[in-house]
């Protein structure tokens, strides 16, 4: 590890080395400017990562950053949840993983992204799953677009701490 690499630090609860199938992978965080919808992700990669990469490296980009460049980060105040979103969000299990669809604004965006019928069917399946003591059925049925919706959480960089971020296109 170079001297520069030894100065990297992981976010709380994260590690710089991940082991997958017995192979260690080093995660090197790359600090950028605040990425917005005015950025082109290819330009961001060239500007910040090109000189750090070596032959055989794999570059991972957070889907939240990609979504922001695609104008898929919506200010909370621009989302007007319908009654159905308010009602459904009350039944979402809160987890340490994040807010998920547990607030009306994120549930509203799930209804828009996935369709009302699909979300209602996912909610129905979730009830059946709970009766059978099985978790996760809602997100399995609702699909990746619902599963990937991020709401504002503590530690999110402003201004995105007041945004709902959808999955990238």
Tell me the role of every PLM-derived stretch.
Residues 2-169:
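N-terminal and secondary-structure boundary signal
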């Amino acid at each position: 590890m170079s001297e520069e690499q030894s100065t990297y630090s992981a976010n709380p609860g994260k590690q710089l080395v991940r082991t997958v199938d017995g192979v260690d992978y080093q995660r090197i965080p790359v600090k950028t400017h605040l990425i917005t919808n005015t950025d082109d992700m290819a330009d961001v990669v060239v500007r910040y990562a090109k000189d750090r990469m070596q032959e055989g490296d794999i570059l991972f980009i957070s889907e939240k950053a990609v979504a922001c460049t695609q104008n898929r980060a919506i200010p909370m105040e621009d989302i007007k949840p319908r009654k159905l979103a308010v009602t459904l969000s009350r039944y979402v299990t809160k987890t340490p993983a994040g807010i998920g669809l547990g607030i009306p604004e994120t549930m509203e965006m799930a209804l828009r992204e996935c369709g009302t019928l699909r979300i209602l069917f996912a909610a129905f399946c979730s009830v059946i799953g709970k009766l059978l003591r099985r978790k996760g059925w809602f997100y399995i049925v609702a699909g990746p677009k619902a599963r990937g919706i991020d709401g504002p959480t503590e530690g999110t960089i402003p201004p995105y701490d007041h945004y709902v971020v959808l999955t990238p296109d």
